[in-house]
């Protein structure tokens, strides 16, 4: 075997390890892989960067803008008015009413904003009707995933595969070509959740309340009295800025709340200082002359709803630049003008100094910030804001109409095959821009450039796997394992490998990695690769067994108070169900 083969195989294995272990961001890993393949002369410059001009990547970028228009205009928020009834009925009826609309909408647009809008709505509705939100949040995430399997534009994974098919000399998938597998899978998957799966979900207390109760254990107030030697000095001068194990996040002066606190803020007699940190270090601080511990005072997060400062919850996204950094080095306060007062991971609060905590994807942050924080950051890709009391800022009704019309125009042109998909998406975006439905800032926020880098890099990696012989080598192993059962055995092998990978790394990366292997496997047994690639598309999106496998799973992980085990209990049977149905349908339609 050649140098290129061994070099590519080693780089390929290291790439998977780095992505699964989240050593650095996925987009950095994949782009670095392309550069290393280029350095090793496995691929040419043209092959390395062909993905940056691929129609699949460009289409995804345009679809981000269309989804952004639906999100920012408040069109998606209208879904809330339809799916939540006023009366309290049995949980199966409620799941019916919620999940089917979610799956339908997710079939035609990015499911992240759909779930982001529904999380606070479900929590608020559940609190009013005495339901447990944890009975609904995982089902909503799964419904969004199932809906995305039904059409070409339902998920970016399908569009990556569409672009790779064209790059490999094939005709791309049609808008509804995947539907004959996706729709039956979605229907049976939803019925499983509604009648069977939800019984395995826990009935957790509303997560915001849990965080509030835990926060009371670690937040205390100290009052400045006459004996304090640093009255009229700044926080920095008083030595309260860089305390070991403590953080001064707020000052209450008469009826005024000062938060976040700045190093230059002066301290005055009678100020109430709010510290968060480990109890033993707080008790050490109270020994300072002039700082009186207010034992009977209660830190109540809900008191801020009517003030200039209020609490927020945010879930760290899988592509966040905060991942791998501790809170201190992340400059969170300076970057977002908000203070972290608690961090929850895997359903429990992390009991250490906040500044030393290394942030991970899925962490739930309890924040204090000013009232405009939500408006400024609700569409950020760094974290998902899930504050119950907030609603998405709405736009005039005519802009809601424009955003919905843009999606309708795209679907009309694609269904009738009047224009190529990228051109149809471009026309829809022109409509949005011409009517100023989105501002320049909103357009930038709508486009997830990290995802686009992953997608563009995927084409160079796929080319490297193919030209080096690594894809053919792995494909041979799959063929040897499944050829006794014919084509269906090989497809099953591809489905299993893809399902395993997609539950521990992003579905986009999984699709890009497995595509050249799938293509090579079909060539080796001399059959049409199309059904194999459709199987890959379904398997790459079928991310149910872990919370880290899909962005919507990650979004509901913290707010639902779930553990890893909760996802596995409902998600693993779903994973098996989807695979079995897909294999049966592939056998029926293609083999």
Model-derived features: where do they sit?
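Membrane-embedded alpha-helical segments and adjacent helix-loop junctions characteristic
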Residues: 28, 32-35, 39-129, 190-198, ...
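Juxtamembrane and boundary regions of transmembrane helices in multi-pass small-molecule transporters
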Residues: 7, 128-134, 138-140, 147-217, ...
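Transmembrane alpha-helix interface/packing and boundary motifs in multi-pass membrane proteins
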Residues: 15-24, 101-110, 142-153, 412-418, ...
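Hydrophobic transmembrane alpha-helices of multi-pass small-molecule transporters
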Residues: 1-61, 65, 199, 203-204, ...
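Juxtamembrane helix-boundary/capping and inter-helix hinge elements in multi-pass membrane proteins
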Residues: 72-75, 85-90, 123-135, 162-175, ...
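Generic detector of multi-pass transmembrane helix bundles and their immediately adjacent loops
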Residues: 469, 475-578, 585-589
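Inter-helical loop and helix-membrane interface segments of multi-pass membrane transporters/permeases
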Residues: 1, 47, 160-173, 344, ...
